[in-house]
Amino acid sequence: MINNVVLVGRMTKDAELRYTPSQVAVATFTLAVNRTFKSQNGEREADFINCVIWRQPAENLANWAKKGALIGITGRIQTRNYENQQGQRVYVTEVVADNFQMLESRATREGGSTGSFNGGFNNNTSSSNSYSAPAQQTPNFGRDDSPFGNSNPMDISDDDLPF
């Protein structure tokens, strides 16, 4: 079975950082993710996805990613249920993020000058914070051109083919 989620979106508010009784950090947040299509009135709609992240990445997210931050997360979808104070069963579906990455600098997000920092932090449970280099733009060396565009057709009969 495969249960993988990759999301890129903006945080709708600062993450809520809490600690379990055994002092394990857990942060909850909502990510606004644009849909790939526009509505009938021409506007792009967004989905608001509830997420949770645990341990050191939770503390890092709460410290570094604030409301409006563009982040990428990887994780899985999880469902759970509990009984509320009125005795009703409540079902919750959320994304459990394994790690996150800041996708823009604070200066860019706040409308300031664009700094030289265009990468982010990759915060997973198996390593400490590490800088991710910005993606490099590779030139298109005629990749869209047909490699056979200037050649003549080949004279091949069906008898020449091995199948």
From Swiss-Prot:
Coiled coil: none annotated. Keywords: DNA damage, DNA recombination, DNA repair, DNA replication, DNA-binding. The gene is ssb2. A motif (Important for interaction with partner proteins) lies at residues 158-163. Homotetramer. PANTHER family: SINGLE-STRANDED DNA-BINDING PROTEIN (PTHR10302:SF27). This is Single-stranded DNA-binding protein 2. It comes from the Bacteria. It comes from Streptococcus pyogenes serotype M18 (strain MGAS8232). GO terms for cellular component: nucleoid. Residues 109-163 are annotated as: Disordered. Residues 119-130 have a biased composition (Low complexity). Residues 1-104 form the SSB domain. One of its GO terms (biological process) is DNA recombination. One of its GO terms (molecular function) is single-stranded DNA binding. It holds the Pfam family SSB. SUPFAM superfamilies: Nucleic acid-binding proteins. InterPro entries: NA-bd_OB-fold, Primosome_PriB/ssb, ssDNA-bd. Plays an important role in DNA replication, recombination and repair. Binds to ssDNA and to an array of partner proteins to recruit them to their sites of action during DNA metabolism. The lineage of its organism: Bacteria, Bacillati, Bacillota, Bacilli, Lactobacillales.
